[in-house]
C-alpha cells in the first residue's frame, strides 16, 4: 500500500492535457490499429464491395443486352407472324376461289345433266305419244272398218 501512496505522490497534478509517455503510446496504438483494420477488414470488405459492384454492373449490362435481344426477337416474330397471316389469308382466298370454281363447274354439269335428262324424257314422252297416236289411229281405223263392215252387213 505504501507503493501506491508513493506512486500517487510522485505524479504532479496536470492540466487539461498531460504530455507524458501515454500520448505517443496511444498514437502508436491508433496507427497500428488503423493499419491492422485496414489490412484485415477494410481492404477485404472493400474488395467484396467492388466485386459486388462489378457483378451488378455486368449483370445490368447483360440484362440490357438480353432485353435488346428479346425485343429484336419479338419484332422478328411479329414480322414472321404477320407474314404467316398474310400467307394463310392468301391460301384461304385461293382455296375459296378454287371451291367456287369447282362449285360452278359442278353446278354447270348438274344443270347440263338435268337438261339432257329432261330433253331425253321429253323425247321419250313425245315418242310414246306418237306411238300411242299411231296405235290409236290404227285401232280407230280397224274399229271404223269393223263398224262399217257390220253396218253394211246388217
UniProtKB/Swiss-Prot annotation:
Entry keyword Membrane: yes
Subcellular location: Cellular thylakoid membrane
Transmembrane residue ranges: 22-42
Chief location of this protein within or outside the cell: membrane
CDD domains documented for this protein: ATP-synt_Fo_b
Pfam families recorded: ATP-synt_B (PF00430)
InterPro entries, A to Z: ATP_synth_b (IPR034679), ATP_synth_B-like_membr_sf (IPR028987), ATP_synth_b/b'su_bac/chlpt (IPR002146), ATP_synthase_B_chain (IPR050059)
GO cellular component: plasma membrane-derived thylakoid membrane; proton-transporting ATP synthase complex
Keywords for this protein: ATP synthesis, CF(0), Hydrogen ion transport, Ion transport, Membrane, Thylakoid, Transmembrane, Transmembrane helix, Transport
GO molecular function, one term: proton-transporting ATPase activity, rotational mechanism
Keyword Protein transport: no
Membrane topology note: Single-pass membrane protein
NCBIfam families assigned: PRK07353.1
Family: Belongs to the ATPase B chain family.
PANTHER family in the record: ATP SYNTHASE SUBUNIT B', CHLOROPLASTIC (PTHR33445:SF2)
Subunit structure: F-type ATPases have 2 components, F(1) - the catalytic core - and F(0) - the membrane proton channel. F(1) has five subunits: alpha(3), beta(3), gamma(1), delta(1), epsilon(1). F(0) has four main subunits: a(1), b(1), b'(1) and c(10-14). The alpha and beta chains form an alternating ring which encloses part of the gamma chain. F(1) is attached to F(0) by a central stalk formed by the gamma and epsilon chains, while a peripheral stalk is formed by the delta, b and b' chains.
Protein purpose: F(1)F(0) ATP synthase produces ATP from ADP in the presence of a proton or sodium gradient. F-type ATPases consist of two structural domains, F(1) containing the extramembraneous catalytic core and F(0) containing the membrane proton channel, linked together by a central stalk and a peripheral stalk. During catalysis, ATP synthesis in the catalytic domain of F(1) is coupled via a rotary mechanism of the central stalk subunits to proton translocation. Component of the F(0) channel, it forms part of the peripheral stalk, linking F(1) to F(0). The b'-subunit is a diverged and duplicated form of b found in plants and photosynthetic bacteria.
Name this polypeptide is given: ATP synthase subunit b'
Species name: Synechococcus sp. (strain CC9902)
Amino acid at each position: 500500500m505504501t507503493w501506491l501512496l508513493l506512486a500517487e505522490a510522485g505524479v504532479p497534478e496536470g492540466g487539461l492535457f498531460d504530455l507524458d509517455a501515454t500520448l505517443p503510446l496511444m498514437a502508436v496504438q491508433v496507427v497500428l490499429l488503423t493499419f491492422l483494420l485496414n489490412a484485415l477488414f477494410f481492404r477485404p470488405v472493400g474488395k467484396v464491395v467492388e466485386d459486388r459492384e462489378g457483378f451488378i454492373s455486368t449483370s445490368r449490362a447483360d440484362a440490357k443486352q438480353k432485353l435488346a435481344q428479346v425485343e429484336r426477337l419479338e419484332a422478328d416474330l411479329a414480322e414472321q407472324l404477320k407474314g404467316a397471316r398474310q400467307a394463310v389469308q392468301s391460301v384461304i382466298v385461293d382455296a375459296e376461289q378454287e371451291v367456287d370454281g369447282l362449285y360452278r363447274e359442278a353446278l354447270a354439269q348438274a344443270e347440263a345433266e338435268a337438261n339432257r335428262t329432261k330433253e331425253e324424257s321429253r323425247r321419250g314422252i313425245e315418242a310414246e305419244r306418237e306411238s300411242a297416236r299411231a296405235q290409236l289411229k290404227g285401232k280407230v281405223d280397224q274399229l271404223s272398218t269393223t263398224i262399217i263392215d257390220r253396218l253394211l252387213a246388217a
